[in-house]
Structures are given as structure tokens and as C-alpha cells.
From Swiss-Prot:
Signal peptide per UniProt: none
Family the entry assigns: Belongs to the IAA-amido conjugating enzyme family.
GO molecular function: indole-3-acetic acid amido synthetase activity
Primary enzyme class: ligase
Pfam family, one: GH3_M
Protein name (record): Indole-3-acetic acid-amido synthetase GH3.6
Length: 612
């Protein structure tokens, strides 16, 4: 008899969940059907509430909220254009510089300016918008994979280092902000956010303790796991590599029901203690699977009820798809949403599609969206280079959300509730289709990025400056760099940057290996703070490698490119290569290889903040 109320409650719960899902799907229908009206209202709301903001008054908007006036008067801007305003707020200016609402914190972008993370202003209510987008994901997924409410998600989620601006505002990545918010920590019970990792393990700032405890909890609940994932593909693969290295200790903890003494965070120990119980049978199972020579399909072997892997595999993350396929035995790789530090943008309405066919439907009430047409030069390029400043004609070329054309590429421009106006995000998108009147975009690339392993983004100019700094080590030996290129090597985890160097040797003095190691370290020291954080704090990037190639290698590279149809007159050495045959050609002519001997310098915060 005591069981009857439970069953009744479960039925009500199932019914209300179905109703909730239905309402969320109807919301998507409504906002995509009325996309242009929603966009008009969003812009009016942003401009009316910020009518007295200094930035808008300076440009002469004078409280007007219509699209035509806004587009005519307000310039399209990059981060550098608004950096003076950002710095004022960071330094403690509490006047209405960019936004009428108080700036609650800065979200640190993985994009950089002057080698430092960009600071994106945000306001308290943005958490509601982010939570809204998250709430759409599982109702969409439920249409394709029903029953996910009956089990758990094993997600490896981490917080990153944060700092405070001189004015006392937190500066941290968007996900760190979200995980530390009451929206996440005090979220009401929801079967779709029922994770194997207790909050305390996610919020542990020690990356080793966080990973160890999350993996242990995932193994203890292995039969309940229906989906696995992380934010980026690279992060999920790091978790599997961690298991590969630490399974004996994890199995020992499961066998004895005692958490490793290396886990010293008391809140983590307490949370894991609620889950960890002595289970010799499970320990035997984990050991027998992990001892096998092949780790192919290890995800489906250890977590047999897993339906899919939820990770971002678009853009530069696509390089990890073969590794994920190997570990998961070809489970669907699902990209659910598209977001950045500036704004949360949209959702994937066909989550089980192939990674190459992923497209995101922009949700029209997240921000006001505009699109700058991208005209690509034909030719061999590894990134799309976009002009920094726009001409008056180009400023007028921007089109609204509902006016984009199928197959055309655009750079995304946003106006947000938190004080960004006609801001160039830097993402290049291609129109792949439409959901009602709202376009669906596939992500093409981040503008100007040539190298990326994790959340780092290194562009050609930055790489060139880093190489220029490094070659000063060669001057005493009467040697110079005649040519170079690079690639992101993800064949081992963590991945690392590789540079191919061809030298011109004028002197007779042999160059000691330590000099080339110094070159590696100088390049790393010259790269942006996101790269250096990945090396030092997150351990998501391995030591940089310089491979010395035979004389004449880059002539061979040019010959190869010309044989594929490149124009001899227009050919220039690519500063980054991704095409496997080219990498093979370069590797076949390597004579020596050197790695950075230690981690570069890095500390949280911006260098201009001093010790803050």
C-alpha cells in the first residue's frame, strides 16, 4: 500500500514533464514564426531602457528606438572600439556608460585583444536568458531520444580561474559564472539536469580533484547514465585519457568505498561520500574493461546505457571526431546549442544529425541580430580574414535576421541587453535552412583564427609576432628563419601546437638544442593569456613543438600546392596547414624536433591590473 502514492506522483510528474516539453516546443514555434516582430520588439526594448546611456547619447540616438534610425546612426564596432568604455567600467566607473542596468560582472572571452582575454559586460538578468536557452535543449532532444528523464547525464563540467577587476567586479568565463550562480546551484529538481557529478565536484577549483571525483561518481552510477558529455570535444577526450591513466586508483576507491587521500577538498569528500559505497563487483568490472588492450568503445562498455555523446564538435573541435568515434563505438555526437561570452544564440533542432550537418536556429528574443555578408577570396586559406574597420557602404550592407539568404556566409553582429551595440562577434556562419521564419546557421569558423586546441584561438598576426620574438635566439649563431608554417596536433591528448621551421644557416657554429627549446618557450610566452592558461592552469594544451625541416622543404610544399591548382603568382606559404597530405609531406622532411622545456608564465587577471 505505501507504494501507491509514489506511483500516482510519478504519473503526475510524467504528465507535467510532457506538458512542460510541449510548452517549450510551442515557444520555439512561436518565436521562429514571428521572428521579425520579436526582433523589432527586442531592439525597441534594449534601446528604450538604455535611452540615457552615455554611449548611445554620444552617438546621437536621442532616445529613438526604431531600426532604421539605429542602423543609420550607430556604428558597427569591434572590441577595440569599445575598449575605453569597458576599461572605465572595469576600473570602477558606476555611471551608465554602456547599460542602464548595473554591470554585475565581466565574462572573459576566449577571444583576445592585445594578448589578454576580452571582457564582455553582463547584467544579472542575462542569467534568465541563458537559463531559458538551456531549458529548450532537452524538450528538443526528447523528440528524438525519449526517456532521458529516467536516468542521469554524466557531464564533465569545470570552473576556471577568475579574477577581480580594479573596480571589484568578477571577471570569469561564462560557464564559470553560470555554474557559480544560484540559477545552477539552487536549480529545482529537474530530471534533465540530474547529473552524476554533485555540484561540489563541479565547483572544486582544483582541476585534478574535480576530474577525479566526477569520474568516480560517474563510474559508481554507471548503469544510470543515459548520456555523457562535456562542453567541448577536447574536454571529454581529456576525461577519457584521465580514466586511462587513473583507473587503478578509481577501481581501488570503488572496491573499498573509501575516497583517495589525494582528494582534500572537504565539500567534495562529503558529496562523494554520499555516492561512494564498497562495491567489489563494480571494481572488478572496471578493472577488467580498463585492462583490455583496446580502448575502442570504452564509453559503451563502461556506461552501457549511453545513448549519445553531448559535446561541441563544430568549428575547430571537428578535429576530435575520429577519436570520439573510436571511444564511443560510433554513438551519435550531439551539438545542442550555440553560445558565446557575448550572448547565448540558439539551439540545434536536429540534434542527431551528422556533425558536418549541424545547424543552429537562432532564438530571436536572445538579442538583436544583424548579419554582415562575407565575401571570401577563392584560394587556399586556413581562416577567413575579415576587415577590422568597415566602410560606410559595408555598414549599410548588414541585413536583419529574417532577410539572410540561403547558402550565403555572414559575420554575426549583436546588440545585447547588457550594453553591446552592433558588436561584431567574429563568428562566420552560413545559412543552412529555415525554421519557420528564423534562419538556421552552420558554424564555419572564427575569423582570423589559425590555431586552436581547446578554447584557445591564435591568429596569424599573433603567431607571426611570437615567431619574430623567438628567432632573436638564432642571431648569435648567424642563422635566420627562411620559412615556417604550423598546425594543431591533436593526435595525442592534450593536443599541442607544432611549428615547422626551415632555417638559413650562414655561420659554422652548431646551434645547441637548448637554443631551440628557448625558441619554443619564447613563442609560448608571446602567445595570448588564454593559450597560457591552457598550458599552466587547465592543462588542456601540451608543450609547443618546433620541427626543423630539410632545406628546400617549403619549395616542395609550393610545388605540391601548384600541382593541386594553386596559382604560382598568387601562392604564399600558408601559416597554418590542416590538409593531411601536406602535414605528411612536412613530417617526412623533419630532421630534428624540440619541445618547450617548461610552462610559460601566466596568472589570472589582466596584466594592466597588477596584483588585482
Amino acid at each position: 500500500m505505501p507504494e501507491a502514492p509514489k506511483i500516482a506522483a510519478l504519473e503526475v510528474s510524467d504528465e507535467s514533464l510532457a506538458e512542460k516539453n510541449k510548452n517549450k516546443l510551442q515557444f520555439i514555434e512561436d518565436v521562429t514564426t514571428n521572428a521579425d516582430d520579436v526582433q523589432r520588439r527586442v531592439l525597441e526594448e534594449i534601446l528604450s531602457r538604455n535611452a540615457d546611456v552615455e554611449y548611445l547619447k554620444r552617438h546621437g540616438l536621442e532616445g529613438r528606438t526604431d531600426r532604421e534610425t539605429f542602423k543609420h546612426i550607430m556604428p558597427v564596432v569591434t572590441y577595440e572600439d569599445i575598449q575605453p568604455e569597458i576599461n572605465r567600467i572595469a576600473n570602477g566607473d558606476k555611471s551608465q556608460v554602456l547599460c542602464s542596468n548595473p554591470i554585475s560582472e565581466f565574462l572573459t572571452s576566449s577571444g583576445t585583444s592585445g594578448g589578454e582575454r576580452k571582457l564582455m559586460p553582463t547584467i544579472e538578468e542575462e542569467l534568465d536568458r541563458r537559463s531559458l536557452l538551456y531549458s529548450l535543449l532537452m524538450p528538443v532532444m526528447d523528440q528524438f531520444v525519449p526517456g532521458l528523464d529516467k536516468g542521469k547525464g554524466m557531464y564533465f563540467l569545470f570552473i576556471k580561474s577568475e579574477s577581480k577587476t580594479p573596480g571589484g567586479l568578477p571577471a570569469r568565463p561564462v560557464l564559470t559564472s553560470y555554474y557559480k550562480s544560484s540559477h545552477f546551484k539552487n536549480r529545482p529538481y529537474d530530471p534533465y539536469t540530474n547529473y552524476t557529478s554533485p555540484n561540489q565536484t563541479i565547483l572544486c577549483s582544483d582541476s585534478y580533484q574535480s576530474m577525479y571525483s566526477q569520474m568516480l561518481c560517474g563510474l559508481c552510477q554507471h548503469k544510470e547514465v543515459l548520456r555523457v558529455g562535456a562542453v567541448f570535444a577536447s574536454g571529454f577526450i581529456r576525461a577519457i585519457k584521465f580514466l586511462e591513466k587513473h583507473w587503478p586508483e578509481l577501481a581501488r576507491d570503488i572496491r573499498t568505498g573509501t575516497l583517495s587521500s589525494e582528494i582534500t577538498d572537504s565539500s567534495v569528500r562529503e558529496a562523494v561520500g554520499e555516492i561512494l559505497k564498497p562495491d567489489p563487483k563494480l571494481a572488478d568490472f572496471v578493472e577488467s574493461e580498463c585492462r583490455k588492450t583496446s580502448w575502442q568503445g570504452i564509453i559503451t562498455r563502461l556506461w552501457p546505457n549511453t545513448k549519445y555523446v553531448d559535446v561541441i564538435v563544430t568549428g575547430t573541435m571537428s578535429q576530435y571526431i575520429p577519436t570520439l568515434d573510436y571511444y564511443s563505438n560510433g554513438l551519435p555526437l550531439v551539438c545542442t546549442m550555440y553560445a558565446s561570452s557575448e550572448c547565448y544564440f540558439g539551439v540545434n533542432l536536429r540534434p542527431l544529425c551528422k556533425p558536418s550537418e549541424v545547424s543552429y536556429t537562432l532564438i530571436p528574443n536572445m538579442a538583436y541580430f544583424e548579419f554582415l555578408p562575407v565575401h571570401r577570396n577563392s584560394g587556399v586559406t586556413s581562416s577567413i580574414s575579415l576587415p577590422k574597420a568597415l566602410t560606410e557602404k559595408e555598414q549599410q550592407e548588414l541585413v536583419d535576421l529574417v532577410d539572410v539568404k540561403l547558402g550565403q556566409e555572414y559575420e554575426l553582429v549583436v546588440t545585447t541587453y547588457a550594453g553591446l551595440y552592433r558588436y561584431r562577434v567574429g563568428d562566420v556562419l552560413s545559412v543552412a535552412g529555415f525554421k519557420n521564419n528564423a534562419p538556421q546557421f552552420s558554424f564555419i569558423c572564427r575569423k582570423n583564427v589559425v590555431l586552436s586546441i581547446d578554447s584557445d584561438k591564435t591568429d596569424e598576426v599573433e603567431l607571426q609576432n611570437a615567431v619574430k620574438n623567438a628567432v632573436t635566439h638564432l642571431v648569435p649563431f648567424d642563422a635566420s628563419l627562411s620559412e615556417y608554417t604550423s598546425y594543431a596536433d591533436t593526435s595525442s591528448i592534450p593536443g599541442h601546437y607544432v611549428l615547422f621551421w626551415e632555417l638559413c644557416l650562414n655561420g659554422n657554429t652548431p646551434i645547441p638544442p637548448s637554443v631551440f627549446e628557448d625558441c619554443c618557450l619564447t613563442i609560448e610566452e608571446s602567445l595570448n593569456s588564454v593559450y597560457r592558461q591552457g598550458r599552466v592552469s587547465d592543462k588542456s594544451i601540451g608543450p609547443l613543438e618546433i620541427k626543423m625541416v630539410e632545406s628546400g622543404t617549403f619549395d616542395k610544399l609550393m610545388d605540391y600546392a601548384i600541382s593541386l591548382g594553386a596559382s604560382i603568382n598568387q601562392y604564399k606559404t600558408p601559416r597554418c596547414v590542416k590538409f593531411a597530405p601536406i602535414i605528411e609531406l612536412l613530417n617526412s622532411r623533419v630532421v630534428d624536433s624540440y619541445f618547450s622545456p617548461k610552462c610559460p608564465k601566466w596568472s589570472p587577471g589582466h596584466k594592466q591590473w597588477g596584483s588585482n
